[in-house]
Amino acid sequence: MRVILAPMEGVLDSLVRELLSEVNDYDLCITEFLRVVDQLLPAKSFYRLCPELHNQSRTQSGTLVRIQLLGQYPEWLAENAARAVALGSYGVDLNCGCPSKLVNGSGGGATLLKDPELIYQGAKAMRAAVPAHLPVTVKIRLGWDSGDRQFEIADAVQQAGATELAVHGRTKEDGYQAERINWQAIGEIRQRLTIPVIANGEIWDYQSAQECMKVTGCDAVMLGRGALNVPNLSRVVKYNEPRMPWLEVVKLLQKYVQLEKQGDTGLYHVARIKQWLGYLRKEYTEATDLFGEIRALKNSKDIALAIQRINR
C-alpha cells in the first residue's frame, strides 16, 4: 500500500514535513497550497513553501514532495504548474477540496466542486503545461453540499488527463464530522475510473486503514489530522506498529522547537507548536498537561525549556 501525507493549510509546513518524514515511511508529501490568482508567482514563493526544491523535491530523509496549487484560472494554474516543475517539484497537485470559508470566498478550493467544468479546464491546462513523465494530481471532496455530482467531478478529473485522484470522503458542508464519512462513495468513484484513486478521511490507526481499503478497494490512503495526533501514523498504518511512545514524541517536540527557533522566533511559530500539541492531546493524555503549562508562554525559548524539563 501507499501512504501519502495530506496537504493541511496552516499545519503541515516544511518543518513538520521534515520531522514526520524522519520517523515515518511516507511515499509522498503534498505541500500546503500555493494560492494562484492572476499572475506567475516568483520563484521565491515556491521555495518558501517548499524548500525541499533545493533537495530534488525530497525531504532530508528522502521522501518525495509535491507542490499543491489553489486557484480558479486555468491559464495561471498552468503557468505556475510549469514553474513548479521547472524548479524541481515532483509533479503538481490541484486543490479542489479545501473547505475554508476564506479560500472558498475567493473562488478556490472546494468552491470548484460546484463547477466540474472548471475543474476539468484547470486540470487539463496543468496537464498540458507539465511534462508527461511528471504527475498531475487532484484532490477533491465528494461535492459542495451533497454527493450528487461526485461522478461528474471525478470524470472531469480523469478526462482532463490527471495522473491520479485523491478523494476526501465527505462534502464541503460535512466539514470533518466523523459520522459523515462515506468510504463507500470513494469506492464507487474508484470502480468508475481507470486512474488510481487515493482514499482520505477518518484513518486513525491500522484497523481503520484496513477497513477503509476494504470498503473502497483503494490501495493508497492519504493521512491528514491523524498524522499529527500520532506522529508515526504511517508506520502504524503500513506495518501495524504501535503508536510512538510519549517520550519519543517529546524528543520530536524538542527538535521542532529548535527548528522553529532557527527559522523564526515570532508568534507565528509559537502558535504552531501549541497547535501541534492540540492535536497530540487527542491521543496522549500527557500532552494535555504540557499544553496547560505552555499555553500562556509567548516565545520558543520558554517553550523549549518547558519541554526539556519533561525528561528530567
UniProtKB/Swiss-Prot annotation:
GO terms for molecular function: flavin adenine dinucleotide binding; FMN binding; tRNA binding; tRNA-dihydrouridine16 synthase activity. Its cofactor is FMN. The record marks R35, N95, Y176, R272, K274, Y279, R295 as: Interacts with tRNA. The active site is at C98 (proton donor). It catalyses: 5,6-dihydrouridine(16) in tRNA + NADP(+) = uridine(16) in tRNA + NADPH + H(+); 5,6-dihydrouridine(16) in tRNA + NAD(+) = uridine(16) in tRNA + NADH + H(+). FMN binds at P7, M8, E9, Q68, K139, N200, G201, E202, G224, R225. Its EC number is 1.3.1.-. Keywords: Flavoprotein, FMN, NADP, Oxidoreductase, RNA-binding, tRNA processing, tRNA-binding. InterPro entries: Aldolase_TIM, DUS-like_FMN-bd, DUS_fam, DusC, DusC_C, tRNA_hU_synthase_CS. It holds the Pfam family Dus. Catalyzes the synthesis of 5,6-dihydrouridine (D), a modified base found in the D-loop of most tRNAs, via the reduction of the C5-C6 double bond in target uridines. Specifically modifies U16 in tRNAs. PANTHER family: TRNA-DIHYDROURIDINE SYNTHASE, TRNA-DIHYDROURIDINE(16) SYNTHASE. Belongs to the Dus family. DusC subfamily. HAMAP family: DusC_subfam (MF_02043). This is tRNA-dihydrouridine(16) synthase. It comes from Yersinia pestis. The lineage of its organism: Bacteria, Pseudomonadati, Pseudomonadota, Gammaproteobacteria, Enterobacterales.
